[in-house]
Regions:
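Conserved GNAT-fold acetyl-CoA-binding loop/helix
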Residues: 31-61, 208-234
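Conserved acyl-CoA
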Residues: 112-114, 123-142, 293-311
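Conserved acetyl-CoA binding element of GNAT-fold acetyltransferases
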Residues: 90, 99-113, 271-288
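A short beta-loop-alpha structural element at the N-terminal edge
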Residues: 11-25, 31-38, 185-212
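Conserved beta-strand in the GNAT
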Residues: 72-76, 82-91, 105, 110, ...
């Protein structure tokens, strides 16, 4: 499944041993750009990039000229033998149903400015789509990329047919939103919440379909098997904070009115040492306005993040800007962060 494509003077192929230093340099350019756009900072330790270059060389030797290794795809663009761009893809299915498309997550796309006018970025994504299509073996597959809001590449993705399907905001967790006492309370989900969570999950799935987000399962019929599986999951003791924790907002009667999943995990080098917090999969009772039920949910998540020494929290799986869900997060102290753009492979 070797990728060899010539577009003008651009050659797209798998990385070769000895190119680790060039690829690590590209990654450093990318992390520096993300930091300028407000993203997570990269390390300034040169030894980290030297180790990264060695790991990339070893990875290239294992690949033996093939872009695909397991579920990971790695492609570089070269001009006259010099690497001028690279992209990674992570191939998986976000769901249990056979009809749910595979997703190839676009990661770390970076191209030297001098190679952009030659179409290196487009060539990399075109080949990544082809790899994804081959891995899917005839099943549908979707390419998905997260693009930070300050990133000037929005127009580039749009020209290639990518369309936004979900949005994110981000907040400083020390700015925990104030919550009105007595109306709604947030807490970790418990097994007895399983039926309510199954209903909310179905609403989330329907919302994703309405946004043309093909990455996830369609709404499922709510039956005893589904509710039992959710209850069993909620009753299981979590081993660490990197596993999703379900949080819920309940009203004065104890009825669940909103839910979300919290994940806190360390960022690996070459990022600077820190923790990343994501609160996503927001599902809200449509009979309720988002703001009052979100406030205690986000406040509780902020407290978990502070305890884990994570400075910020991303709020993902949001509807488009200008809608009540998205705007509620801004009212609670978040700012625009990123969007997910997708296209069929």
């Amino acid at each position: 499944m070797a990728a060899v494509t010539v577009r003008e003077r651009i050659l797209v192929r798998a990385p070769s041993p000895g190119e680790g230093i060039q690829i690590a340099g590209l990654w450093r350019e990318l992390w520096d750009a993300h930091e300028r756009w407000g993203g997570y900072p990269g390390t300034r330790d040169e030894r980290v990039y030297a180790r990264l270059a060695n790991r990339l060389d070893e990875d290239a030797r294992v690949r033996g000229g093939q872009p695909v290794l397991g579920r990971h795809i790695h492609l570089v663009a070269a001009i006259h033998g010099q690497v001028c761009g690279q992209v990674e893809g992570w191939f998986e299915r976000h769901g249990a149903e056979a009809r749910t498309p595979y997703t190839c997550e676009v990661r770390s796309l970076i191209v030297h400015p001098r190679a952009r006018v030659l179409g290196a970025g487009k060539a990399l994504l075109t080949n990544l789509a082809r790899m994804s299509h081959e891995l899917a073996r005839g099943a549908p597959s979707v390419l998905a990329a997260e693009v930070l809001e300050p990133n000037p590449a929005h127009g580039f993705y749009e020209r290639l047919g990518y369309r936004p399907v979900a949005w994110s905001s981000r907040m400083v967790v020390s700015h925990e939103p104030r919550v009105r006492a007595g109306e709604f309370v947030a807490r970790p989900a418990e097994p007895q919440d399983a039926l309510a969570l199954a209903v909310l999950e179905s609403m989330l799935a329907a919302r994703r379909r309405a946004a043309h987000d093909e990455r996830f399962d369609r709404p499922r019929a709510i039956d005893a098997t589904l509710v039992g599986a959710i209850a069993a999951h909620l009753g299981r003791r979590h081993r660490d904070a990197s596993e999703p924790h379900e949080l819920v907002t309940v009203d004065a009667r104890g009825d669940v009115r909103a839910a979300a999943s919290l994940v806190i995990s360390p960022l690996d080098p070459p990022f600077a040492r820190t923790r990343r917090t994501i609160l996503g999969r927001f599902a809200i009772d449509p009979a309720r306005e988002p703001l009052p039920v979100l406030a205690p949910l986000i406040a509780l998540a902020c407290r978990f993040a502070i305890a884990a020494e994570a400075p910020t929290m991303e709020l993902t799986d949001l509807t488009l800007p200008g809608t009540p869900l998205y705007d509620a997060t801004l009212s609670l102290g978040a700012h625009p962060w990123s969007r997910i753009v997708t296209r069929l492979a």
